[in-house]
Amino acid sequence: MPININKFILDMERFDGTLKKYPEDFIVEEITPEGTVLEVGKEIGFEDVEKWHGSFIHFTVEKTNWNTMDALKQIVRATKTKRKNFGFAGTKDKFAVTTQRFGCFGLKKEQLENINIKDIVIRDVQKTNKKLRMGGLWGNKFTIKIRDLNLSEKEIKRISDLKLDYVLNYYGIQRFGLIRPITHIVGKFIYERDFESAFYTYCGTPINETGDSLEARQLVDMGEFKKALKLFNRGHDYEKRLIQQYLKYKDFKMAFTALPPQLNSMFVNAYQAYLFNEMINKRFDYGFDELEGDILEDNTPTGTLIGYDTKFSGGIQGEIEKEIVERENLDLKKFKIEDFGNFYGTRRKMVTPIYDFKSRFENEIFELSFKLERGNYATIVTREFTGNLS
């Protein structure tokens, strides 16, 4: 089951290169709703809210080779504060240098002062009365280096002259799984209420794996759950939770209650994203200028993330959306899934602008810098040049 990322904006011969050779090759700096870039290595100096009632603390976390959730676990442990008190505006990947705002209810500035976690820096601590919620950012600034290029002067000149103003608004590989792109497959099984297949797909089905991890997944596929548990390591906490819960209740649906609700929602969201990516592919030949019947956002045609409350476009775009629903044999009411959530469906722009795009070659390194609104993927931009998603 592919992830439906097939089309390109740039008409060019793409080049091979190494992305993310070092974490410093992929810098992600969060941009606040007010437009402030949380620059790496820079103190911003956010002012405390004047009439502060002691509710929330916000702070910037700069981290190298940490994803958001793992960094948060360490900060929770260091501050001896409950996980549920924390929030963040957006998630960041691991193999990168990233900045982002965290928020916490009832935390004191002093609790952050003596934190010593390798490759994590905390600064810009601010007292405020507002809770930091998911989506509470404008977007991100990316500075990306692609290494190990072997290009002629002519090729360098050709690529340097390219200008990229917008990109297809695909959901990137991160939504489906960098190593094992199966999140959307699990989501489809959950939508179909086939929890047994969802379980085996997530815990079994080895892809791009070796050693104990490969053997553990093979054991799951054979039904040898207890043996598999002994081989899954610390990086497979969710697989272990699922298996332990299944062994306790002998119920595949019940097994998924051992996972965080956000993760269970993410499975179905990934299936919606997979279908959305296909809409982009089918719309591509018609172009992305406004057509009769389009539903627009910022004067840009949108596609639907299919859910129980989906409102279809008219015209050609509506035909595309309905064709996918019919082919997948979808019953929209079934997107209300007990114990997993109500997936009402929304709309998303099919192309998205790129802001402040710059590129340069230096010492056989191609460096890109640009800004994207929240929810958009930098790897979709780099793919326009390299053809690769990771």
From Swiss-Prot:
It comes from the Archaea. GO terms for biological process: tRNA pseudouridine synthesis. It catalyses: uridine(13) in tRNA = pseudouridine(13) in tRNA. Keywords: Isomerase, tRNA processing. Pfam families: TruD. GO terms for molecular function: RNA binding; tRNA pseudouridine(13) synthase activity. It is an enzyme of class 5 (isomerase). Transmembrane segments: none annotated. The keyword Cell division does not apply. Its EC number is 5.4.99.27. Residues 166-353 form the TRUD domain. The active site is at residue 93. NCBIfam families: tRNA_TruD_broad. HAMAP family: TruD. Belongs to the pseudouridine synthase TruD family. Could be responsible for synthesis of pseudouridine from uracil-13 in transfer RNAs. This is Probable tRNA pseudouridine synthase D 2.
